[in-house]
C-alpha cells in the first residue's frame, strides 16, 4: 500500500487513515488504492467493520485533489473500483463503514463520509459541497445522498452556494451520528465499531441489503419484495446457525458466538 493510506487491523475491525498532506485530498491514483482497500475489506471474511479517517486534526479530506486537476486530471477521470475515494460507488457492501471525521470534510471528502453507514465527527468538523463554485458538481454521491437526509431548502443552499455546516448543526439535522472532542474521536469510533461487531454479521448484511433495495418503495410493496425470495441475505439469516445461537445465548445468559452462517 502507498504512503497515502495507513491500514491497521484490530481483530475484525479495519482502520484506514488517509494521509496526503496538506488536506488529505484525493487524486485518481489514491482513489484507485482506496477502492482496492474497500473491495478487499468487502471480500475478507475475517473483517467485520471499517473505520475511515484522515491524518491530522484539520482535514478529514478536502475531496478531489485540485493540484491534480490543474495538472490535467479530468473531473470524469477513472477513479477506480468503488468510484471516487473507493467507496462512493460500492453498492453491494454488506459490512458497515464508519467515517471518523476529524476536521474539514469538503467536496469529495463529504461525499466519502456520506457513503459510510455512520459518521462520528470531532467538534471542529465542518461539511461542505463547494463544487458549484469551482465550475463542477458533487456527482460522487453528494447531490444524490444529501437530499435523502436534509430538507430541499438546506440541500439547495449547500450545493448551490457551498455553505458550510458545522458539527453541531450536522448532528441536529441527522447528518452525523455523534459529535465528540477531537481527543475522543477514534476511541468513540472504535467503541461504535465494537458494538457493530457484537451484532450478528448475517443480520447486518441483511439489514444493509433491505435498506438499499427497498428505501424508495411504499411499505406494503417493500414487504412483498422482502418476502418474494429475491434477496440474498435475508433468507440466509432466517435459516442460519446464528439465528439459533442468538436466542440460545440469551436464554443461557451468555454472549453469542457468531459464525456468520
Curated annotation (Swiss-Prot):
Pathway field: Amine and polyamine metabolism; carnitine metabolism
Enzyme Commission identifier(s): 4.2.1.149
GO terms for MF: hydro-lyase activity; L-carnitine CoA-transferase activity
Keywords from the UniProt entry: Lyase
Species for this entry: Escherichia coli (strain SMS-3-5 / SECEC)
Protein name, entry field: Carnitinyl-CoA dehydratase
Active-site residues from the entry: 111 (nucleophile), 131 (proton acceptor)
The protein's enzyme class: lyase
Amino acid at each position: 500500500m502507498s504512503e497515502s493510506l495507513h491500514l491497521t487491523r484490530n481483530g475484525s475491525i479495519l482502520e484506514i487513515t488517509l494521509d496526503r498532506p496538506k488536506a488529505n485530498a484525493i487524486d485518481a491514483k489514491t482513489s484507485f488504492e482506496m477502492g482496492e482497500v474497500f473491495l478487499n475489506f468487502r471480500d475478507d471474511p475475517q473483517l467485520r467493520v471499517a473505520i475511515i479517517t484522515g491524518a491530522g486534526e484539520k482535514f478529514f479530506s478536502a475531496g478531489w485533489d485540485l493540484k491534480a486537476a490543474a495538472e490535467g486530471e479530468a473531473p470524469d477521470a477513472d477513479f477506480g473500483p468503488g468510484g471516487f475515494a473507493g467507496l462512493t460507488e460500492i453498492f453491494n457492501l454488506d459490512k458497515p463503514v464508519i467515517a471518523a471525521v476529524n476536521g474539514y470534510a469538503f467536496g469529495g471528502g463529504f461525499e466519502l463520509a456520506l457513503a459510510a453507514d455512520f459518521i462520528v465527527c470531532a467538534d471542529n468538523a465542518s461539511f461542505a459541497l463547494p463544487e458549484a463554485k469551482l465550475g463542477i458538481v458533487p456527482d460522487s454521491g453528494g447531490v444524490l445522498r444529501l437530499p435523502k437526509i436534509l430538507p430541499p431548502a438546506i440541500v439547495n443552499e449547500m450545493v448551490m452556494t457551498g455553505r458550510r455546516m458545522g458539527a453541531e448543526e450536522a448532528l441536529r439535522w441527522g447528518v452525523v451520528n455523534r459529535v465528540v472532542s477531537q481527543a475522543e474521536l477514534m476511541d468513540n469510533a472504535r467503541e461504535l465499531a465494537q458494538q457493530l461487531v457484537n451484532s450478528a454479521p448475517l443480520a447486518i448484511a441483511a439489514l444493509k441489503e433491505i435498506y438499499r433495495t427497498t428505501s424508495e418503495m411504499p411499505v406494503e410493496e417493500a414487504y412483498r419484495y422482502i418476502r418474494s425470495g429475491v434477496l440474498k441475505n435475508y433468507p440466509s439469516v432466517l435459516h442460519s446457525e446464528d439465528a439459533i445461537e442468538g436466542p440460545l445465548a440469551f436464554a443461557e445468559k451468555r454472549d453469542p458466538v457468531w459464525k456468520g452462517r
